[in-house]
Structures are given as C-alpha cells and as structure tokens.
Amino acid sequence: MHRRGVGAGAIAKKKLAEAKYKERGSVLAEDQIAQMSKQLDTFKTHLEEFASKHKQEIRKSSQFRVQFQEMCATIGVDPLASGKGFWSEMLGVGDFYYELGVQIIEVCLALKHRNGGLITLDELHHRVLKGRGKFAQDVSQDDLVRAIKKLKAMGNGFGMIPVGGTYLVQSVPAELNMDHTVVLQLAEKKGYVTVSEIRESLKWEKERACHVLDHLLKEGLAWLDSQAAGEPQYWLPALFSELLSQDVTPEEANQMTP
C-alpha cells in the first residue's frame, strides 16, 4: 500500500496553527515582560522610600551602606554612577565617594617616596581612618574598593592587584604584567623575595626572574638589599610590615634590613 501524501490543505492548516501558537507565545512574553517591569518599578519605589527613611544610617554606617548597595545592584541601580541625580542628592553618596577618592590620592602621594606607589588595602584603610578622625563617617574596605574603581575609571593609574586574600593598591601608571603580579604574591608572606626563591617556586629561568625584579626596582616598587646573607634580597616596601607605621626613606630602611 502507498501512503497518501500530505495535502495542501493540511499543510496550510498546520502553518496556521503554528502562527497562532507563535502569536500566543509573543503575547505571553509581552505580558511577562510587562509584569516584570511593573515589579521592578514597585521595587525601585520601595527602595527609594527605604533610602529616604534610612539615609542617615546609609551615610554613617559602612555595613548598612554595603547592604543598601547590594539591594540597588539587584535592580541595576548604581548610586555611584553619577555625581548628580536622585540618589546622589538624597544620600550624598556621590560627594562621599568623591571626598574618599581625594583622601586615597593624598595618602598614596604622601607614601609614594616610601613604597613606589604600591600599598596594601589594609594599610590604606588604616591611614584613611586615621586621617578622617574619630567623628567622621565610618569607612570600610568595601568603600575604599568602590572609590578606587571610580578612580581607575578616570584613567589616572589606579588599580588593584590580588595578593594573599587581600589587595595591593597601585597608584602609579606603572606597567605590571602577570609576571610582576605573581612575584608580588610570592613576596607577600615575608615582604621580600630572592632570585632563587622565584626560580624554585615558579620554575623560571634566572633571566626571567631578574628581568621582573629589575623592572620593579626601576619603577621604585622594590628596594635591593645587596648585603643580605646568601644572596641579594628584593624588598617590597608595600609588604614590609616593619615599615607600615613609619615614614622612612630607602636609606633608613637599608639600615633596618638584616
């Protein structure tokens, strides 16, 4: 027996059904989008009411500020996106992060002679708090990170390098590639590193290790202790814990190193 072919009428009927399903699907999608948009508008309204009611806590408490910014992020609102507008005018967060950015720049410039433009996030936090005084708004490390990201977007050399669960803040436009970063991470525990340690830990050739260390010396990010026992040590002042609370020159630091 021969199977009967599908007739033109059946094909047309099938296409009509598919078109209706597609149209119905489009209507459902539009309804869902409209509902989601309405829910977002409602959430944004509640968020604005919450911000208005708790603006003093948001300004004063760093923990409260982090939680509020996480709430904003869920609907794509960035209170830091502009220095003007509803959020900045209501909360003053634009001015807060602008002033914090200025403080960060001042601290980094004051210590550049000592650390070459690299500073741990912990030390930066300590010095910013010290400079603000005990009656100023509280500042968290999260606030610092947000302010640094704003500075980085301005293209003035600021950036962050992950080291041992925290960050090194870079405040100079020095070219640091992945090789430089892994050497900084290697030096994190002791504050210094040697060519032999780099070769043993990273399995590099001597020329590669020396090239990276020479670059760090040239940029002022490392100091050389050529009198160290065994072989020269390359100290990273940003990681050198004995110097964290002291403003000393490289000459003074050489007298302190073993």
UniProtKB/Swiss-Prot annotation:
Gene Ontology CC: one annotated term: ESCRT II complex
Coiled coil regions, renumbered to chain: 28-50
Keyword list, A-Z: Coiled coil, Cytoplasm, Protein transport, Transport
Coiled coil listed as a keyword: yes
Localization per record: Cytoplasm
GO biological process: forebrain development; optic chiasma development; protein transport to vacuole involved in ubiquitin-dependent protein catabolic process via the multivesicular body sorting pathway
Disruption phenotype: Morpholino knockdown of the gene results in a stunted appearance, reduced pigmentation, small head and eyes, developmental delay, reduced forebrain size, and aberrant optic nerve and optic chiasm morphology.
InterPro entries: ESCRT-2_cplx_Snf8, Snf8/Vps36, WH-like_DNA-bd_sf, WH_DNA-bd_sf
Claim: Transcription regulation is one of the keywords in the record: no
Protein function: Component of the endosomal sorting complex required for transport II (ESCRT-II), which is required for multivesicular body (MVB) formation and sorting of endosomal cargo proteins into MVBs, and plays a role in autophagy. The MVB pathway mediates delivery of transmembrane proteins into the lumen of the lysosome for degradation. The ESCRT-II complex is probably involved in the recruitment of the ESCRT-III complex.
Family the UniProt entry places it in: Belongs to the SNF8 family.
Known partners and oligomeric status: Component of the endosomal sorting required for transport complex II (ESCRT-II), composed of SNF8, VPS25 and VPS36.
UniProt-recorded name of the protein: Vacuolar-sorting protein SNF8
Record organism: Danio rerio (Zebrafish)
